[in-house]
């Protein structure tokens, strides 16, 4: 059986720390503790170890970080400019604390994914690229034509009934000349995508333009993933931003069982491959052990 009692954060789903420890310490059991991490950088390692070693109900372990020195920082505010480059994981103990952050990120034109959904409609991105393919003389399949026609106004951009695309098969490709000559397209091939796809919302057009100016690669999934800590277990990223805000209910749970919350934040800290940014809370309610540890080290 493979398991890590320090990351058993799904107690409500049957991840029983006591059961795992009991099985590991049963007479005749052979324990093999992995002594080398190939993810956790040296700068994060002492903070993670210091946190989890406060738990009494655990299997003692000694393990080494990877060769990467890495970086750990303790900013006093959520600096969204950090997201300009690199692969990121934004983590918080609850979705509630991520909602406002996601709203701020959208307002600043930051491209991210959360729960499998992108902050910008994939349809909008695909339509923009499809129009550019037409401009470059490439052919589009039926599903691509339907997509751009969805964002083009009838009468001004398309002849009446053009969206029916009568007689077109799924495997057929259509060029700009085909669409203009046989399928009711009225727009010039020189028309910029944002003018051609005039039914796309202004917000999405602005965001796509902003991302293109920043040289964001929209042909790939977002570099930034937003998740609760529980949702990110098993994941990793080069850079992790960890929000330490907790709810009032979370604070009550911490007073009842601090070891459970330490496991949660230990799991979050150990997602980072290069950098960990532990952000100060916006309210007075926080899981403060990591930042308190940092303050002690600075004295």
What are these regions (language model features)?
Residues 135-279:
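Conserved helicase C-terminal RecA-like lobe
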Residues 71-87:
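Conserved interdomain hinge at the start of the Helicase C-terminal
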Residues 298-299:
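Acidic, low-complexity intrinsically disordered tails
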Residues 49-53, 80-85, 163-174:
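Short secondary-structure transition/capping segments
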Residues 283-295:
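Charge-dense, low-complexity polyampholytic segments
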Residues 111-153:
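Charge-dense polyanion-binding interfaces
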Residues 1-68, 85, 89-107, 113-122, ...:
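Conserved helicase motor core of SF1/SF2 NTP-dependent helicases
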Residues 46-51, 125-133, 293-294:
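Short, surface-exposed amphipathic charged segments that create phosphate/polyanion-binding patches used
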């Amino acid at each position: 059986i493979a398991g890590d009692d320090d990351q058993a954060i799904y107690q409500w789903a049957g991840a029983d720390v006591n059961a795992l420890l009991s099985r590991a310490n049963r007479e005749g059991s052979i324990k093999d503790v992995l002594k080398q991490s190939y993810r956790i950088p040296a700068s994060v390692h002492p903070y993670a170890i210091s946190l989890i070693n406060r738990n009494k109900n655990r299997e003692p372990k000694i393990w080494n970080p990877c060769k990467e020195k890495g970086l750990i920082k303790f900013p006093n505010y959520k600096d969204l400019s950090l997201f300009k480059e690199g692969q990121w994981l934004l983590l918080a103990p609850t979705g509630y604390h991520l909602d406002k952050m996601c709203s701020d990120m959208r307002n600043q034109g930051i491209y991210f994914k959360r729960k499998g959904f992108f902050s910008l409609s994939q349809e909008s991105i695909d339509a923009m690229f499809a129009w550019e393919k037409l401009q470059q003389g490439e052919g589009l399949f039926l599903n691509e034509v339907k997509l751009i026609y969805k964002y083009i106004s009838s009468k001004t951009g398309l002849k009446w009934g053009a969206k029916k695309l009568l007689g077109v098969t799924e495997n057929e490709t259509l060029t700009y000349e085909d669409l203009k000559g046989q399928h009711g397209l009225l727009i010039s091939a020189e028309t910029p995508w944002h003018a051609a796809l005039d039914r796309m919302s202004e917000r999405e057009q602005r965001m796509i333009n902003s991302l293109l100016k920043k040289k964001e690669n929209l042909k790939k999934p977002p570099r930034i993933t937003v998740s609760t800590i529980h949702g990110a277990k098993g994941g990793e990223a080069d850079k992790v931003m960890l929000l330490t805000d907790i709810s009032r209910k979370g604070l009550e749970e911490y007073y009842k069982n601090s070891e459970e919350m330490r496991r949660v934040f230990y799991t979050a800290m150990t997602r980072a491959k290069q950098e960990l940014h532990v952000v100060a809370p916006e309210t007075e309610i926080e899981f403060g052990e990591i930042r308190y540890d940092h303050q002690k080290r600075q004295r």
